Structure formats: structure tokens, C-alpha cells
Design a protein with these regions (language model features):
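ABC family nucleotide-binding domain
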Residues: 4-208, 212-215
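Conserved switch/coupling elements of ABC/ABC-like ATPase nucleotide-binding domains
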Residues: 217-223
Length: 223
């Protein structure tokens, strides 16, 4: 399928007072188009930091990130905003839905921000496949945690991003809903050829991925 994402020698250090933490140390790997990759590691191993850098939400101290061959770690301002709108989807652990919008309006929002045409048939299929058709007109406080995370997944998939990043997407869910969400991401990768990079501490969830990258002792992760 060809390479879609590449990290080269990514390093990141944080400092809090006199304490210096090396979150990432020369981290390098690549992801193929349509691949579902799970990044696993203990708490504090740097996996969420890595995800934020890959998604352009944070910058590395050293190293480069490429998406579809474009070096993104140096993008700024309007170019960075445009890149995120066109290329990146992100699923958060806490859903991050807007409480004043219905499920359908939440899914529409990134399309409107990016000035993308709304494919109503595609959205209806997404809602049906994710099992949230009945939630279409509900507000977030009227939905369960599992339903809210499915809406968040629909929102991320609606723009057809080059890469979909998921940061502990099952962290706030019970075991049944967690497995359901992991299975949904796996199907999205297989059915739509969606490239997905998921961070998780749960090895059982990671088993749904095509490939698992392990981060050990806040050091390096290599392909």
C-alpha cells in the first residue's frame, strides 16, 4: 500500500523545576497506508507524547515527522491549521463532544470547519455501521459513554483523514464497550483502508491492530 506516516529520530524532553524527563529518545518507525497500529506501554512511557507529535499537536525537540511524504514538524500558523483539517483525525479518551450540539451536529462540525462538502449518504452509513442511528438527534448528556465514543469515532472518520489518531479511546469504557470500539476501529481500517494509530495501555485492545509497537522504559520505539 505504501508508506503514509514516518517518524525519524523523535526526541522530546520536559522540565518541571529541576526535574528533567526524557519522554522520547530517538523514536523512529513508519506506518503503511491502511494499517492499524497500536502503540502500547506503561503509564509515563511517552506514548501519548508521541501521538501528539505525530498528529502535529506538539513539536519534537529533535527529529522529523512525515505524512504522505510532507515534513510536518515545522509547519506553523495557517499551513498547520490547514494540514490538520485536511489530513488528521483525532479521537480523545474523554470524547470531547460539544454539549450544545446533537450527535449529528457534532459529526458535521469538522466538515463545516474544513469547508468540505457533506455526503449525507456517507454520514448515514457511518451512523448505521457504528450503531448510533438512534442517537442522531440526542445531545451528549443523553448518551452513554459507549455511544459518545462512537459519535466521536464517526466525527473523526467523516472527514476521511489521511491518518486517524486515537489516544486511549477505550480508557473510560467498560470491557464490553471497549471491545466494541476496538472492533469498530479495526473494521474501519479494513473496510475503508483507514490508517489508524492508537495509543493504549490495554494489550487486549491492542490485539485488534495489525501491528503493535511497544515503548519500554521511556526510551525508544523502533520498527
Amino acid at each position: 500500500m505504501g508508506e503514509i506516516l514516518r517518524a525519524e529520530n523523535i526526541s522530546k524532553t520536559y522540565q518541571a523545576g529541576r526535574v528533567v524527563v526524557k519522554a522520547l529518545n530517538r523514536c523512529s518507525f513508519s506506518v503503511e497506508r491502511g494499517e492499524f497500529v497500536a502503540v502500547v506501554g506503561r503509564s509515563g512511557s511517552g506514548k501519548s507524547t508521541l501521538l501528539r507529535i505525530l498528529a502535529s499537536f506538539d513539536k519534537p525537540d529533535e527529529g522529523k515527522v512525515y505524512v504522505e511524504g510532507e515534513e510536518i514538524s515545522g509547519l506553523k500558523g495557517k499551513k498547520l491549521a490547514q494540514f490538520r483539517q485536511e489530513k488528521i483525525g483525532f479521537i480523545y479518551q474523554d470524547y470531547s463532544l460539544f454539549p450544545e450540539y446533537t450527535a449529528y451536529e457534532n459529526v458535521l462540525l469538522p466538515l463545516k470547519i474544513a469547508h468540505q462538502a457533506v455526503d449525507k449518504e456517507q454520514l448515514e452509513r457511518l451512523f448505521e455501521e457504528l450503531g448510533i442511528t438512534d442517537c442522531r438527534e440526542r445531545y451528549p448528556d443523553e448518551m452513554s459513554g459507549g455511544q459518545k465514543q462512537r459519535v466521536a469515532i464517526a466525527r473523526a472518520l467523516a472527514t476521511r483523514p489521511a491518518v486517524l489518531f486515537a489516544d486511549e479511546p477505550t480508557g473510560n469504557l467498560d470491557a464490553e464497550n471497549a471491545e466494541s470500539v476496538a472492533a469498530i476501529l479495526s473494521r474501519a481500517s479494513m473496510r475503508y483502508g483507514q490508517t489508524i494509530v492508537m495509543v493504549t495501555h490495554d494489550r487486549q485492545m491492542a490485539d485488534y491492530a495489525d501491528r503493535i509497537l511497544s515503548m519500554e522504559n521511556i526510551v525508544a520505539c523502533m520498527k
